[in-house]
Amino acid sequence: MGSASRASLDSARRVLAELGGVDLSTAGQLLGAGRAIGGSTHLLSALADTGIAPEVKHSIVDRVFGATVQEPALRVLRAVVDGRWSSHDELLAGIEELGIRAVAISAPEGTPVESELFTFGRAVSTDDGLELAFGDKLGDPEAKSTLVHRLLDGRASEQTVVIVEQLVQQPRGRRIGELVRHAATLVADQAGLTIATVSVASPLSPEQSERLAQALSRRYSRRIELNQVVDRDLVGGLRVQIGDDVIDGSVATRINDLRLQFA
């Protein structure tokens, strides 16, 4: 995201924070408004046009969404259109991020939204049929939404369902795995956490997980949430990825390094 878009997003995030608590209905309305804006080239162009005065854009937002969107979501949308966005896609990305953060805020304490997203993403990535169904660019968004409900209703929180519905209905050219990982990162960040994806040959015990999380928290000066991926090809040891940082202590990598040394 460009610097202008990042500054605009930061400003809109402050407005979201000033709302205090938001409910899931408000968060869903914000995401729905983003989909509506993305589905109308004329509306998107008008709201992203830096030559149109903010008060005129406010009027457009109120006229289009005033009857269906509650005031808290309207306040966030007005803050979005007040900003300068580097591209139309980044404006839509900004609304989506704000909506996902609003969903995270709406979750009751202890709701495992981030881990549910991680589990869903892993399930899709290991099922070619699901990946194809969600990744089909010509697929009906409503059919994808129906599939989300069939897979997640009764198995995941309402918050997770709302987020995944958003991702499959407005992918904007992104793959489902990328979408879910990014959403999980936003949910964790909203809770003050950083995600560490830990690949291991066999599952860590609760005690090992706790020690690793504490060690990583000290290293990064931030609370760390572990997501485990079992990969038998690692043979032993583990590989940790936090953002762009990779700590690779797997036996497979050490063996490969030795092979290269003796090649």
Curated annotation (Swiss-Prot):
Family annotation (PROSITE patterns): ATPASE_DELTA
Membrane topology label: Peripheral membrane protein
InterPro entries cross-referenced by the UniProt entry: ATPase_OSCP/d_CS (IPR020781), ATPase_OSCP/dsu (IPR000711)
Localization terms from the record: Cell membrane
GO molecular function, one term: proton-transporting ATP synthase activity, rotational mechanism
Coiled-coil segments on the chain, per record: none
Keywords from the named record: ATP synthesis, Cell membrane, CF(1), Hydrogen ion transport, Ion transport, Membrane, Transport
Coarse class of the protein's main subcellular location: membrane
GO CC aspect terms: plasma membrane; proton-transporting ATP synthase complex
Keyword Ligase: no
Disulfide bonds, paired cysteine numbers: none
Similarity comment: Belongs to the ATPase delta chain family.
Subunit description: F-type ATPases have 2 components, F(1) - the catalytic core - and F(0) - the membrane proton channel. F(1) has five subunits: alpha(3), beta(3), gamma(1), delta(1), epsilon(1). F(0) has three main subunits: a(1), b(2) and c(10-14). The alpha and beta chains form an alternating ring which encloses part of the gamma chain. F(1) is attached to F(0) by a central stalk formed by the gamma and epsilon chains, while a peripheral stalk is formed by the delta and b chains.
Purpose of the protein: F(1)F(0) ATP synthase produces ATP from ADP in the presence of a proton or sodium gradient. F-type ATPases consist of two structural domains, F(1) containing the extramembraneous catalytic core and F(0) containing the membrane proton channel, linked together by a central stalk and a peripheral stalk. During catalysis, ATP synthesis in the catalytic domain of F(1) is coupled via a rotary mechanism of the central stalk subunits to proton translocation.
Protein name in the entry: ATP synthase subunit delta
Lineage of producing organism: Bacteria, Bacillati, Actinomycetota, Actinomycetes, Micrococcales
Gene responsible for this protein: atpH
